Amino acid sequence: MDSGKLYSFAFKGLLTEEALDKAGRKSKDDFSAVWESETSKRLGLSLMDEEFVVKSRRMAVVYTAICSFENSVREFIAKKLLEEKGENWWDLCVKKEIRTNAENRKKSEKDVRWLTARGNSMIYYTEFGDLISIMAKSENWKFFEVHVGKIEWAKQIIETLEKSRNIIMHSGELAPTDIERVGMYIRDWIRQVG
Protein backbone atom coordinates (compact mmCIF):
# COMPACT_ATOMS: atom_id res chain seq x y z
CA MET A 1 0.00 0.00 0.00
CA ASP A 2 1.49 3.37 -0.96
CA SER A 3 1.86 6.11 1.63
CA GLY A 4 -0.85 8.31 0.03
CA LYS A 5 -3.48 5.60 0.37
CA LEU A 6 -2.35 4.81 3.91
CA TYR A 7 -2.54 8.49 4.89
CA SER A 8 -6.01 8.79 3.34
CA PHE A 9 -7.21 5.68 5.16
CA ALA A 10 -5.87 6.86 8.54
CA PHE A 11 -7.22 10.40 8.06
CA LYS A 12 -10.69 9.08 7.16
CA GLY A 13 -10.59 6.97 10.32
CA LEU A 14 -9.80 10.02 12.45
CA LEU A 15 -12.59 12.01 10.79
CA THR A 16 -15.01 9.15 11.42
CA GLU A 17 -14.01 9.03 15.11
CA GLU A 18 -14.54 12.79 15.42
CA ALA A 19 -17.93 12.63 13.69
CA LEU A 20 -19.07 9.78 15.96
CA ASP A 21 -18.02 11.76 19.05
CA LYS A 22 -19.89 14.87 17.84
CA ALA A 23 -22.97 12.74 17.13
CA GLY A 24 -23.05 11.62 20.76
CA ARG A 25 -21.32 8.26 20.63
CA LYS A 26 -21.40 6.59 24.03
CA SER A 27 -18.08 5.75 25.64
CA LYS A 28 -17.64 2.76 27.92
CA ASP A 29 -17.75 5.19 30.86
CA ASP A 30 -21.09 6.58 29.67
CA PHE A 31 -22.40 3.06 29.26
CA SER A 32 -21.33 2.20 32.79
CA ALA A 33 -23.06 5.26 34.23
CA VAL A 34 -26.25 4.56 32.28
CA TRP A 35 -26.17 0.88 33.22
CA GLU A 36 -25.61 1.71 36.90
CA SER A 37 -28.48 4.20 36.92
CA GLU A 38 -30.91 1.80 35.24
CA THR A 39 -29.85 -1.12 37.42
CA SER A 40 -30.17 0.99 40.57
CA LYS A 41 -33.78 1.71 39.61
CA ARG A 42 -34.50 -1.96 38.90
CA LEU A 43 -33.09 -2.94 42.29
CA GLY A 44 -34.96 -0.25 44.19
CA LEU A 45 -31.84 1.33 45.70
CA SER A 46 -33.72 4.61 46.20
CA LEU A 47 -36.00 2.79 48.65
CA MET A 48 -33.13 1.68 50.88
CA ASP A 49 -31.36 3.46 53.72
CA GLU A 50 -28.96 5.95 52.10
CA GLU A 51 -26.19 5.24 54.65
CA PHE A 52 -26.16 1.54 53.73
CA VAL A 53 -26.23 2.33 50.01
CA VAL A 54 -23.26 4.73 50.30
CA LYS A 55 -21.19 2.23 52.32
CA SER A 56 -22.07 -0.57 49.92
CA ARG A 57 -21.12 1.52 46.88
CA ARG A 58 -17.73 2.27 48.43
CA MET A 59 -17.15 -1.43 49.01
CA ALA A 60 -18.40 -2.23 45.50
CA VAL A 61 -15.35 -0.45 44.10
CA VAL A 62 -13.06 -2.55 46.31
CA TYR A 63 -14.95 -5.72 45.40
CA THR A 64 -14.57 -4.88 41.71
CA ALA A 65 -10.80 -4.72 42.13
CA ILE A 66 -10.64 -7.99 44.08
CA CYS A 67 -13.00 -9.82 41.70
CA SER A 68 -11.04 -8.62 38.67
CA PHE A 69 -7.80 -9.69 40.31
CA GLU A 70 -9.19 -13.11 41.23
CA ASN A 71 -10.40 -13.74 37.69
CA SER A 72 -7.09 -12.57 36.21
CA VAL A 73 -5.27 -15.09 38.44
CA ARG A 74 -7.68 -17.82 37.30
CA GLU A 75 -6.99 -16.93 33.66
CA PHE A 76 -3.24 -16.79 34.28
CA ILE A 77 -3.27 -20.29 35.79
CA ALA A 78 -5.57 -21.77 33.15
CA LYS A 79 -3.58 -20.30 30.25
CA LYS A 80 -0.24 -21.35 31.70
CA LEU A 81 -1.36 -24.93 32.35
CA LEU A 82 -3.07 -25.18 28.96
CA GLU A 83 0.16 -23.98 27.33
CA GLU A 84 2.33 -26.42 29.30
CA LYS A 85 0.09 -29.50 29.63
CA GLY A 86 -2.51 -29.19 26.88
CA GLU A 87 -6.28 -29.47 26.79
CA ASN A 88 -6.39 -32.06 29.58
CA TRP A 89 -4.64 -29.76 32.09
CA TRP A 90 -7.61 -29.77 34.50
CA ASP A 91 -7.38 -33.53 35.04
CA LEU A 92 -3.59 -33.66 34.97
CA CYS A 93 -2.72 -30.62 37.10
CA VAL A 94 -5.50 -30.16 39.67
CA LYS A 95 -5.80 -32.26 42.82
CA LYS A 96 -8.76 -34.64 42.86
CA GLU A 97 -10.29 -32.97 45.94
CA ILE A 98 -10.33 -29.56 44.24
CA ARG A 99 -11.72 -31.05 41.02
CA THR A 100 -14.46 -32.89 42.93
CA ASN A 101 -15.47 -29.77 44.88
CA ALA A 102 -15.54 -27.70 41.70
CA GLU A 103 -17.54 -30.33 39.83
CA ASN A 104 -20.04 -30.58 42.71
CA ARG A 105 -20.37 -26.78 42.80
CA LYS A 106 -20.98 -26.69 39.04
CA LYS A 107 -23.56 -29.48 39.26
CA SER A 108 -25.32 -27.79 42.17
CA GLU A 109 -25.50 -24.51 40.27
CA LYS A 110 -26.58 -26.26 37.06
CA ASP A 111 -29.60 -27.65 38.93
CA VAL A 112 -30.74 -24.04 39.38
CA ARG A 113 -31.23 -23.43 35.66
CA TRP A 114 -32.35 -19.83 36.00
CA LEU A 115 -28.97 -18.86 37.49
CA THR A 116 -26.22 -17.77 35.11
CA ALA A 117 -23.21 -20.08 34.92
CA ARG A 118 -19.93 -18.81 36.41
CA GLY A 119 -17.82 -19.46 33.36
CA ASN A 120 -16.92 -21.95 30.69
CA SER A 121 -13.86 -23.35 32.49
CA MET A 122 -13.85 -25.50 35.61
CA ILE A 123 -11.33 -23.16 37.23
CA TYR A 124 -14.21 -20.69 37.75
CA TYR A 125 -15.84 -23.20 40.10
CA THR A 126 -12.83 -23.40 42.40
CA GLU A 127 -12.44 -21.34 45.54
CA PHE A 128 -10.06 -18.39 45.57
CA GLY A 129 -7.68 -20.22 47.93
CA ASP A 130 -7.62 -23.27 45.65
CA LEU A 131 -5.65 -21.25 43.13
CA ILE A 132 -2.60 -21.37 45.40
CA SER A 133 -2.93 -25.15 45.74
CA ILE A 134 -3.06 -25.52 41.97
CA MET A 135 0.07 -23.40 41.45
CA ALA A 136 1.95 -24.98 44.37
CA LYS A 137 1.29 -28.60 43.33
CA SER A 138 4.76 -30.06 42.87
CA GLU A 139 4.30 -30.91 39.18
CA ASN A 140 2.92 -27.43 38.45
CA TRP A 141 5.22 -25.14 40.42
CA LYS A 142 7.95 -25.12 37.76
CA PHE A 143 5.51 -23.41 35.37
CA PHE A 144 4.70 -20.64 37.85
CA GLU A 145 7.94 -20.11 39.76
CA VAL A 146 9.47 -18.00 37.00
CA HIS A 147 6.49 -15.61 37.25
CA VAL A 148 5.62 -15.70 40.95
CA GLY A 149 9.02 -16.19 42.54
CA LYS A 150 8.00 -17.55 45.94
CA ILE A 151 4.77 -19.39 46.63
CA GLU A 152 4.61 -17.95 50.16
CA TRP A 153 4.41 -14.46 48.66
CA ALA A 154 1.53 -15.45 46.36
CA LYS A 155 -0.20 -17.29 49.20
CA GLN A 156 -0.09 -14.23 51.45
CA ILE A 157 -1.58 -12.04 48.73
CA ILE A 158 -4.38 -14.43 47.84
CA GLU A 159 -5.25 -15.23 51.47
CA THR A 160 -5.38 -11.53 52.39
CA LEU A 161 -7.50 -10.63 49.37
CA GLU A 162 -9.80 -13.58 50.01
CA LYS A 163 -10.36 -12.45 53.62
CA SER A 164 -11.00 -8.88 52.45
CA ARG A 165 -13.43 -10.11 49.81
CA ASN A 166 -15.27 -12.22 52.38
CA ILE A 167 -15.71 -9.22 54.68
CA ILE A 168 -17.27 -7.26 51.82
CA MET A 169 -19.42 -10.18 50.66
CA HIS A 170 -20.85 -10.56 54.15
CA SER A 171 -21.94 -6.91 54.37
CA GLY A 172 -18.81 -5.67 56.11
CA GLU A 173 -16.82 -2.55 55.39
CA LEU A 174 -13.04 -2.42 55.07
CA ALA A 175 -11.07 0.31 56.80
CA PRO A 176 -9.03 2.68 54.61
CA THR A 177 -5.80 0.90 55.64
CA ASP A 178 -7.30 -2.43 54.53
CA ILE A 179 -8.27 -0.89 51.19
CA GLU A 180 -4.73 0.45 50.77
CA ARG A 181 -3.37 -3.03 51.49
CA VAL A 182 -5.69 -4.57 48.88
CA GLY A 183 -4.46 -2.05 46.31
CA MET A 184 -0.83 -2.57 47.27
CA TYR A 185 -1.10 -6.35 46.92
CA ILE A 186 -2.85 -6.11 43.55
CA ARG A 187 -0.24 -3.67 42.23
CA ASP A 188 2.60 -5.85 43.56
CA TRP A 189 1.14 -8.93 41.84
CA ILE A 190 0.73 -7.09 38.54
CA ARG A 191 4.31 -5.78 38.68
CA GLN A 192 5.65 -9.26 39.48
CA VAL A 193 3.42 -11.56 37.45
CA GLY A 194 1.95 -9.27 34.82
Predicted features and spans:
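Amphipathic alpha-helical interface elements
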Residues: M1-G194
